[in-house]
């Protein structure tokens, strides 16, 4: 029995999809425990590139059962568009299962999201506008709509009418928008009920039974540690807990059943949207990482902000999640760049901080303290063992490992599933 949690260690886009794709073929279940269609990931299988948003990367596994857990917020229109797109390319999504307790994104959530961001102007957080935050707000406010609700029309109608009593007041009186008609939202959800019904299960029961039977479960967290609503760069965060603890809550698998926690981290750092970013680059190297690394958001098409590796964040992520292992990705992007700076600490108002500053105000003012290491010029995309890497690449990896708080067990040297060096197998941990 193995229960492995995959967590992004930075601000997302670290390569979680690749890690899930590799491990997904070795497990019986792949679970997405949080998030929605606001964070995409790219998976390359058999030379084919798949861009997934709501579905877990495990949907591309030929054997694993993919599950959307209770912590996910689901846009049904986006869900079925993604399923249809995969099946049109020959992929089989028929094994997908969905927790009855997952919450649903209503059209009015998307409207509220976009209107609020527009109203905030320069103070906007930079959301994707897909209604994720407002859906989580309704969940916490106990006025949300869950998957199970669309199979009972009277409950569904009651919940929607109750929610719109308040939301229409806000839309009309505060934002000068038209009121939303409740019946249109009711019919929107009912139109998906028949197709959705065969997919819905008691996911918590299913997963715990599987673990009792000695089966293997992989939990694929969305977003990343630094976007966690509690542990991230608040308020420039998502509305859920994409950390290891959140994976337990969003799946119904208890923390004592977790056998490994795998942090996914790039050999440099990226971020999408607003918020502090101490190692961000504004010169030719930022453009270089953006271009060579293909740093454009899968979900939004926005260019990602790029910067050097930040070991302060790596140590923080390791501590918050209790990482047993790290999966280092995109090492190949750093080939041939001369010298590679590594952020080892921050300076805040003249004081050195080796760990994450306690306050967001200090983090906003943090200046990186760098040490540099020489880069390598050799092509490493064909390396399959650590010893095949150039010595300078080996030295860089080992230095990052020393600084980051957990052992490096996987190294990505290209986008393909096979372009991975395995130092330690978490399935055997």
UniProtKB/Swiss-Prot annotation:
GO biological process, one term: IMP metabolic process
Cited Pfam families: Adenylsucc_synt
CDD domains the UniProt entry points to: AdSS
Enzyme class label: ligase
Residues involved in substrate binding: 298-304
GO cellular component assignments: cytoplasm
Main location: cytoplasm
Sequence similarity: Belongs to the adenylosuccinate synthetase family.
UniProt subunit comment: Homodimer.
Functional summary from the UniProt entry: Plays an important role in the de novo pathway of purine nucleotide biosynthesis. Catalyzes the first committed step in the biosynthesis of AMP from IMP.
Name the record gives this protein: Adenylosuccinate synthetase
